[in-house]
């Protein structure tokens, strides 16, 4: 069973990348991205949109299942690498990427966030969260991903903070303390947006 669901996720993400529409070119030759707000309606529909993977588990039930059928048992052997991105950060890569409006958002160990063109892998922006020198990490420096909602990207950090970034630029919108890292608190989880309560958990 474990192998089956992993293949399902892999096939779904590859199908998702293949299904992404081409973006228009701006006058300066750069791609233009039509960043629509990630509304509660979009989040509730989960994987209904074949061009998006809007949260860690795909939907609020965290099924991690994609209904796309482009990749199957017969043609999976024909897949080839479309692009590759290396973070350059030591440690494990345990994050599940999220995709919205042609942009893939990914985290690496030590709280680095990347926005990549989902079609080409081209880096669009990067955020490096400053960690304190006296940080005590109990169980490794991994981060398991981001949440997106409206025009923001959310990440929980090793020093027990919740950071909101602008989806378009990667600039910090706000940065708030969850608890005191000096008391041993930390967070590696991918946040979840609970819109009816207007909160990020």
Per-segment meaning from a language model:
Residues 28-87, 122-135, 171-180:
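Aromatic (tryptophan-biased) beta-strands that constitute blades/sheets of beta-rich domains
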Residues 8-19:
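Bacterial N-terminal signal peptides
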Residues 55, 106-107, 155-156:
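Conserved beta-strand element within WD40/beta-propeller blades
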Residues 198-201:
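Conserved small/polar residues in nucleotide/adenosyl-binding loops
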């Amino acid at each position: 069973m474990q192998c089956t669901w992993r293949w399902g996720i892999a096939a779904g993400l590859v199908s998702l990348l293949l299904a992404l529409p081409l973006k228009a070119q701006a006058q300066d030759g750069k791609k233009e991205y039509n960043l629509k707000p990630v509304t509660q309606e979009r989040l509730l529909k989960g994987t209904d949109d074949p061009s998006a993977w809007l949260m860690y588990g795909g939907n609020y039930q965290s099924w991690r299942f994609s209904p796309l059928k482009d990749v199957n048992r017969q043609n999976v052997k024909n897949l080839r690498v479309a692009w590759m991105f290396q973070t350059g950060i030591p440690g494990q890569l345990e994050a599940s990427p999220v995709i919205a409006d042609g942009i893939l958002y990914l985290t690496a160990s030590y709280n680095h966030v990347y926005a990549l063109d989902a079609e080409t892998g081209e880096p669009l922006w990067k955020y490096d969260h400053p960690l304190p020198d006296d940080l005590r990490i109990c169980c490794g420096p991994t981060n398991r991903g981001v949440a997106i909602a409206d025009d923001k990207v959310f990440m929980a950090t090793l020093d027990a903070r919740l950071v909101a970034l602008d989806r378009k630029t990667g600039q910090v919108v706000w940065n708030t303390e969850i608890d005191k890292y000096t008391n041993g608190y930390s967070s590696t989880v991918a946040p979840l947006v609970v819109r009816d309560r207007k909160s990020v958990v």
